[in-house]
């Protein structure tokens, strides 16, 4: 089985840590969810701490987990600068093996990254096992049908023109040390039969208009239907599924760009407990 293919390393991780630092409507949405569903919580795919840091600043008990040690290193640096302390775990979602059990696990924009359906299924099962009874697993998924380029790239004539050329130009952003960084991406291939797209990202680092470093990473993206994700959640043991749109309380419709899935751990699947569960969530013998 292949490992997840993602691109959150090196210069790309540095870009995310420098410029992708502000949360949008998802910030308040997941904050309210944690306050309602309970703590401790786990930010699955926490990246450089875009959501994790403000949640900690709000006084919530939230751990972080990410597959990329590069981006977790940036998250640690940001936490230290702000005087914040939490647990950060460098693990893949499908291999989740943490010492705590959570009342809330949420995943922002990471379901489908890696391009392997079986890994996503395993990740859901691992999330189920890491929840306390009645715990909540929530994630958002950006639909492809409202993204014309992504949708059209499935057509035979579009697939034949792949891989795309790199964009001829890109905006450079200035880093604190005076260097400039730019990111561009392109589609390499699409497979409508497997519902997978393969994309590349190129990061370039400039100093006084001289290119001093270039990195290229490849990422596979799974595409799912709403019903497929529901079936996967149910197979993992989740029940009481709710699906909302665009980080609101509106029931999801075809006009929404982001679907938010909220699922509860099914008590009927629980075996007789073999571990004491203290209030802080740590499993002890």
Language model regions located:
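SAM-dependent methyltransferase
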Residues: 138-228
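Conserved class I S-adenosyl-L-methionine
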Residues: 1-39, 50
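A short beta-strand submotif of the Rossmann-like class I SAM-dependent methyltransferase core
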Residues: 107-110
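Class I SAM-dependent methyltransferase "Motif I" SAM/SAH-binding loop
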Residues: 45-47
């Amino acid at each position: 089985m292949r490992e997840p293919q993602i691109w959150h390393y090196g210069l790309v991780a540095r870009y995310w840590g420098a410029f992708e630092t502000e949360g949008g409507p998802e910030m308040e949405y997941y904050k309210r969810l944690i306050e309602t569903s309970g703590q401790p919580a786990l930010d699955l795919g926490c990246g450089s701490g875009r959501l994790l840091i403000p949640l900690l600043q709000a006084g919530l008990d939230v751990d972080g987990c990410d597959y990329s040690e590069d981006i977790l290193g940036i998250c640690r640096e940001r936490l230290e600068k702000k005087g914040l302390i939490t647990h950060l775990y460098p693990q893949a979602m499908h291999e989740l093996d943490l010492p705590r059990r959570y009342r809330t696990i949420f995943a922002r924009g990471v379901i489908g990254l890696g391009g392997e359906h079986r890994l996503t299924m395993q990740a859901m099962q691992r999330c189920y096992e890491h929840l306390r009874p009645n715990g909540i697993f929530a994630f958002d998924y950006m639909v492809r049908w409202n993204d014309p380029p992504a949708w059209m790239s499935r057509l035979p004539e579009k697939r034949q023109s792949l891989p795309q050329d790199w964009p001829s130009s890109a905006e450079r952003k200035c880093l604190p040390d005076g260097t400039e960084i730019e990111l561009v991406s392109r589609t390499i291939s699409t497979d409508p039969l497997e519902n997978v797209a393969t994309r590349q990202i190129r990061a370039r680092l400039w100093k006084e208009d001289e290119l001093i470093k270039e990195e290229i990473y490849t990422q596979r993206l799974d595409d799912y239907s709403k019903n497929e994700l529901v079936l996967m959640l149910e197979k993992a043991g989740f029940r009481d599924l709710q699906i909302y749109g665009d980080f609101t309380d509106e029931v999801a419709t075809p006009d929404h760009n982001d679907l938010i899935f909220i699922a509860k751990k099914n008590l009927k699947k629980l075996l007789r407990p073999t571990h004491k569960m203290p209030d802080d969530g740590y499993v002890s013998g």
